[in-house]
């Protein structure tokens, strides 16, 4: 259940989530209809075993999951059938259908194919820290994150969540760290980075499995390149890649964090899940608070 990517948003800590269990059932995921392309709504964080449980809260952490059902209708299939229809009409009437007629034919084909199309299911998990006013979405896609915000907004009626905003340029901070400026306590460099020439269309350099403080990196910095992605390690607990878009990718929970699970005395699947949720939430909070200070992240109040 550990998140692998984090797209973060801020929201006011004054928001009231006390009625969330009442508000979610009306916006629960409904099966995609025969003539619908997709459906979105909340599902149980625990999967099919507890379908009626649409949220999970432990202290100040709230776990929500947005589910989706999407019809798979390959464009190549539609276009192939459309060309056959067009060819039949051309042979029968001696002329090719107009653009408007082709569009109508295509719409009719989609309408005909939708009820027979395969359905792909998906889920996107999110953790809300109600004390510090941020939401961490398990996705590296800003669009996926915004979709989750939209679903929460639909449930609450209002949800003024905003993407993270740094009061200092993230590139400048990341470049400074790789150039030798002191990192926040507990943070160290990993072995991966991406550097770009600031001019439009400039060179891009990607380094992996490499010592990031050395002559080769220094030459790129001297040439004016700026760091846009940087691998970092938080103590022995987390490793991740931080981008200048403030998205956290390749998040991995290390032994320093996972060892805490071995000391848990609770038994049972739910107890184990709660232990993992508690651990993950606490580590993400620690990371967020560190980045909040280092990057001067704006609040949403």
UniProtKB/Swiss-Prot annotation:
<dbReference type="GO" id="GO:0043590">
    <property type="term" value="C:bacterial nucleoid"/>
</dbReference>
<keyword id="KW-0963">Cytoplasm</keyword>
<protein>
    <recommendedName>
        <fullName>Recombination-associated protein RdgC</fullName>
    </recommendedName>
</protein>
<dbReference type="GO" id="GO:0000018">
    <property type="term" value="P:regulation of DNA recombination"/>
</dbReference>
<dbReference type="InterPro" id="IPR007476">
    <property type="entry name" value="RdgC"/>
</dbReference>
<comment type="similarity">
    <text>Belongs to the RdgC family.</text>
</comment>
<comment type="function">
    <text>May be involved in recombination.</text>
</comment>
<dbReference type="GO" id="GO:0006310">
    <property type="term" value="P:DNA recombination"/>
</dbReference>
<dbReference type="Pfam" id="PF04381">
    <property type="entry name" value="RdgC"/>
</dbReference>
<keyword id="KW-0233">DNA recombination</keyword>
<dbReference type="GO" id="GO:0003690">
    <property type="term" value="F:double-stranded DNA binding"/>
</dbReference>
<dbReference type="GO" id="GO:0005737">
    <property type="term" value="C:cytoplasm"/>
</dbReference>
């Amino acid at each position: 259940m550990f998140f692998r990517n984090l797209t973060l948003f801020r929201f006011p800590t004054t928001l009231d989530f006390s009625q969330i269990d009442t508000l979610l059932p009306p916006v629960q995921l409904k099966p995609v209809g025969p003539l619908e392309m997709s459906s979105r709504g909340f599902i149980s964080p625990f999967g099919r075993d507890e379908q009626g449980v649409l949220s999970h809260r432990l202290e100040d952490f709230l776990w929500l999951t947005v589910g989706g059902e999407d019809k798979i209708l390959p464009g190549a299939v539609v276009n192939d059938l459309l060309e056959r229809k067009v060819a039949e009409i051309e042979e029968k009437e001696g002329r090719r259908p107009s653009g408007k007629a082709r569009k109508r034919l295509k719409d009719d084909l989609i309408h005909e194919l939708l009820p027979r199309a395969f359905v792909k299911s998906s889920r996107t998990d999110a953790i809300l820290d109600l004390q510090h006013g941020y939401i961490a979405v398990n996705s590296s896609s800003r669009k996926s994150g915004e979709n989750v915000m939209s679903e929460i907004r639909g449930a609450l009626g209002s949800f003024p969540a905003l993407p993270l905003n740094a009061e200092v340029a993230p590139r400048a901070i990341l470049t400074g760290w790789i150039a030798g400026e002191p990192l926040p306590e507990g943070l160290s460099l990993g072995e991966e980075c991406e550097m770009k020439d600031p001019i439009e269309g400039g060179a891009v350099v990607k380094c992996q499995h490499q010592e990031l403080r050395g002559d080769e990196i220094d030459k790129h910095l001297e040439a004016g390149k700026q760091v846009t992605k940087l691998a970092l390690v938080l103590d022995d607990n987390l490793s991740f890649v931080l981008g200048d878009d403030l998205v956290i990718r390749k998040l991995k929970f290390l032994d320093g964090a996972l060892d805490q699970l071995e000391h848990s005395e609770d038994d049972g699947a739910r107890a184990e899940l709660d232990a993992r949720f508690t651990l993950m939430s606490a580590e993400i909070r620690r990371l967020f608070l560190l980045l909040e200070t280092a990057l001067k992240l704006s609040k949403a109040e």
